[in-house]
Curated annotation (Swiss-Prot):
Residues 1-41 are annotated as: Disordered. This is ATPase inhibitor mai-1, mitochondrial. It comes from the Eukaryota. Residues 39-87 form a coiled coil. Disulfide bonds: none annotated. InterPro entries: ATPase_inhibitor_mt. It is found in: Mitochondrion. One of its GO terms (molecular function) is ATPase inhibitor activity. Belongs to the ATPase inhibitor family.
């Protein structure tokens, strides 16, 4: 086994690696693989949560737009009534 892959021993990959990676060999590779899977899952969960938050924000913004449009229509109607009453 060469000393150039993930889990191939301490001092590789920039960090101390921890005791599992220090073991090297297949145990170290398995530990490195599990660690990478963990971080990929964490990243996926974060992205999923961000997506849900953005979708909720969009839904809320769309509702606010509808509410504002209703208020605008009411104001326009009142203006028409005022103009009608003044014969303008």
């Amino acid at each position: 086994m060469s000393g150039s892959g993930s889990g191939s021993g301490a001092g590789h990959g920039g960090g101390s690696g921890g005791s599992i990676r220090e073991a090297g060999g297949s145990l170290g590779m398995m530990g490195a693989t599990r660690e990478e899977e963990y971080f990929r899952r964490q990243q996926k969960d974060q992205l999923d949560n961000l997506k849900k938050k953005l979708e909720a924000d969009m839904t809320q913004s769309q509702q606010e737009i509808r509410d504002h449009e209703k208020v605008l229509e009411q104001h326009q109607q009142r203006l028409k009534e005022i103009e009608k009453g003044h014969g303008t």
